[in-house]
UniProtKB/Swiss-Prot annotation:
Gene giving rise to this polypeptide: cheB3
Phylogenetic classification of the source organism: Bacteria, Pseudomonadati, Pseudomonadota, Gammaproteobacteria, Pseudomonadales
Cellular compartment(s): Cytoplasm
Domain comment in the entry: Contains a C-terminal catalytic domain, and an N-terminal region which modulates catalytic activity.
Pfam families xrefs: CheB_methylest (PF01339), Response_reg (PF00072)
Protein name according to UniProt: Protein-glutamate methylesterase/protein-glutamine glutaminase of group 3 operon
Origin superkingdom: Bacteria
Claim: Cytoplasm is one of the keywords in the record: yes
Similarity comment: family membership: Belongs to the CheB family.
Length: 337
């Protein structure tokens, strides 16, 4: 994989160089010391992956991510030395299309491979996502769409790259007294999950908190999957975290949650698949449609990364394909019936 480093700190650059060099399949193709330089370098030599710092002179990592994803899109991972202090910037960058976030590996650590392991795992996962070329599954006839009733309601939302900003827009568009439960599955490391819930609560104006083991989704609640395990709905209506299936690249998996909703939810439900790279959520959304639930995929024009919604559209998993700004209104209309 061809990797670029964008960082103004020489020690951080050297630490990242050494970490990347631990895997012979990876090579550093260029280094930029600020975001403006990175934007220019991407027009000259587009890498497979950029390791992007947040705090830099001239142009910071948030604006650089926005510019690169708009002009020469490629995979971006945010690399930071202070996650707590930079949590809001992290979600801004992810809102513009950054895929993930990881700590800067320590230079001179006793076991270099162990220190670099979190970064190398992220690179491996993103390499798999960028390179995957699965053929779309065969289409099947969906069950007739269920009309909303007076039964309890659930909105299951999956998102990845570009998700934080998309979730902010969607949640902002919902009324304060929205009657259904909402469960969010965003590809984010558990270290950042609590910060994301806090950020969404502040930015979107609806209280968002982490989903707890064993609790049922309740009307009016907005719950965010909060660990590196998958979240699923059990037959008794409670939420549970599980390590299985272990072979899922992203944790939490959107497919795992959507599939459990299709299998066990006995009220009204809507599945929503937002911006993101890869195919996670497409098959689960299709299962929800086959059970007669309303399913919605974000359209290409409003997606920061048109991967997951595109995969859903390709297998006819979405009953409706909508611009982001029109999804909240559709949910409100559906549950008002």
């Amino acid at each position: 994989m061809k990797i670029a480093i964008v960082n103004d700190m020489p020690l951080a650059v050297e630490a990242l160089r050494r970490a990347v060099a631990l895997e012979p399949a990876h090579q550093v193709v260029w280094v930029a010391s600020n975001g403006a330089e990175a934007v220019q370098r991407c027009t000259e030599q587009l890498p497979d992956l950029i390791l992007m710092d947040l705090i830099m002179p001239v142009m910071d990592g948030v604006e650089a991510t926005r510019r690169i994803m708009a002009e020469t899109p490629c995979a971006i991972v945010i690399v930071t030395v202070d996650r707590k202090q930079n949590v809001h910037r992290v979600f801004e960058a992810m809102g513009h299309g950054a895929l993930d976030v990881v700590d800067t590996p320590a230079l001179g650590a006793g076991d270099a491979r162990e220190a670099a392991a979190p970064l190398l795992r992220k690179i491996l996962n993103i390499g798999w996502l960028v390179g995957q070329q699965r053929a779309p599954a065969a289409r099947s006839v969906a069950a007739p769409l269920r009309e909303a009733s007076q039964r309890r309601g659930l909105v299951a939302i999956g998102s990845s790259a570009g998700g934080p900003a998309a979730l902010e827009v969607l949640l902002k568009g919902l009324p304060a007294a929205f009657p259904a439960a909402i469960v969010l599955v965003q590809h984010v490391d558990q270290v950042f999950a609590a910060g994301m819930a806090e950020w969404l609560s502040s930015a979107a104006g609806l209280p968002v908190r982490l989903a707890r083991e064993g609790e049922p989704p309740q009307p009016g609640q907005v719950l965010l999957a909060g660990t590196n395990h998958h979240i699923r709905l059990l037959q008794n209506g409670q939420l549970a975290y599980t390590a299985e299936p272990v072979n899922e690249i992203y944790r939490p998996s959107i497919d795992v949650f959507f599939e459990s909703v299709a299998r066990y939810w006995n009220g009204d439900a809507v599945g929503v698949l937002l911006t993101g790279m890869g195919r996670d959520g497409a098959q689960g959304l299709k299962l929800m449609r086959q059970q007669g639930f309303l399913t919605i995929a974000q359209d290409q024009a409003s997606s920061a990364v048109y991967g997951m919604p595109k995969a859903a559209a390709a297998i006819d998993a979405a009953v409706e394909i909508r611009p982001l700004e029109r999804i909240a209104g559709r949910l409100t209309e559906f549950f008002a019936k």
